[in-house]
Amino acid sequence: MKNIIDVELRTRTVDFSQCKTDLLVIGQFSDVERLDRLTRELDSKLDGAIERLIKLGDFKAKEGTNAVVYGNGRIEAERVLLVGLGEKKKSPAELGEPRFTRGPLDTVRKAAANAAKKAVEMKMGSVSLALHKAFGGQFDLSAMGRAMAEGTYFGSYRYDEFVTDSEDGRLDRLKVEVIDSDSAKTEKLNRGVSRGVIIGKAQSYARTLTNRPANVINPAGLAAAAKELARDYERLSCTVLDEKQMAAKGMGGVLAVGSGSQNKPRFIVLKYNPPNKTASKWPTVALVGKAITFDSGGISIKPAEKMEEMKLDKTGGIAVLGTMKAVAELQLPLNVLGIIPAAENLPSGSSYRPGDIITTFSGKTVEVQNTDAEGRMILCDGLSYAVKQNCNIIIDIATLTGACRVALGKYMAGLMGNDDKLIKQLQTAAEDSGEKVWPMPSGDEYAQEMKSKIADLKNIGSKWGGACTGAAFLRQFVGDAKWAHLDIAGVDVFDKATEFTAEGSSGFGVRLLTTYLMNLAES
């Protein structure tokens, strides 16, 4: 098996023209005719090669584009990579916003991802990033550093773990540095880079676990990964309930979904213990992630086309794992509980059936009308567990409904909840992290559709508003806790490679949830 590309990222103070590297990366806006000072200085040493490239129309600087200019011994860098930044965003003063203005941060993140992906394709061993210079110092350098680090990990990622054919010159390691000629600026960049490295590594970790197929990662395998994570970080502890222990507690939702598979379900709990004696006074945040390690639909079986992608139905649970990894590394001053109900949804003689009535961990009964609406069946037990642990804030994340993908496409996750402040905090975190969300309703009108005539609830509503009725079902299990639901169906996977990253799992949710927790800790 191949190892995932190992990225080493640091900051360095160095004059740009004296930076010895395979690839020096700078940014250019599409609607700014005059080159920034750094680019002008480089271009003067390159005999105007950059300006000629732009004037000839060979590089239009649109977002997601790039062009290579060779150093030819005129500068220390072997190559200069021009990365398109698209149209220039207004300055913070013009926008009336703080210096960490969010739009440009995602521009920088995407540009770094584009550059890292290009570096991997070109098999460049060393890369130096100076993307922040195009913004002229208008934005917070720490935030810029974090965005560049996150983008570097996102763009350099590729999943070829089980490809046995050798690839000539395949990169095993990519050395990246964020550079500036001013040591004070480098120090500010470094504060953000150090955080971005932690978050970027956590997202890559989540992408790899999610990409692994169901014969490699089943519920027990996911539990083993959680235990390994807890061994790696002293502030994490892990508890795993097997099917007998779940039965003793009455976790009927998870048990029903997993009943058809020989790979029995697991209920995984990761607890983060913060490094502060006053932690008992702080609220506890629960992250609840759906982990269906393979979803055939059960007896209500899915079409064969694209069923292989159903290994990705564990994305929500693994996003929680990745977030817990980042939280432990960052040592945030918060109480955080990661709850991951894990099961495999397969048809067999022992599967749960349409028409069955299931008693969940909360005591509420659910009429099963479709076994392919299984995510909510396991999440309701996870949410009830969080309530019984007296968690003040509960956020669940799941590839819950195809309806959400129909509504929002592959660009945004659906965001629902019962607390306006929490919703706004998650929207802010989405803007900060570049993982976009869109608010959707889940109120009483939708809850009415989930009532059953022969049980407390049924597990599907009508064909209309499926993302909203799915969230309304989950809402019945959160009690008085502040709750938010992220439906990430649609944003969980890249069907094909983009200008910014490889195809496969996106790792969506790790940056968003970690950013939310970082913002909460700072507030």
Region annotations inferred by a language model:
Residues M1-T284, V288-A291:
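Short amphipathic alpha-helical segment within the helicase RecA-like ATPase core
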Residues F59-K60, S126, L222-S523:
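A generic structural signal for tightly packed, nonpolar segments enriched in small/aliphatic residues
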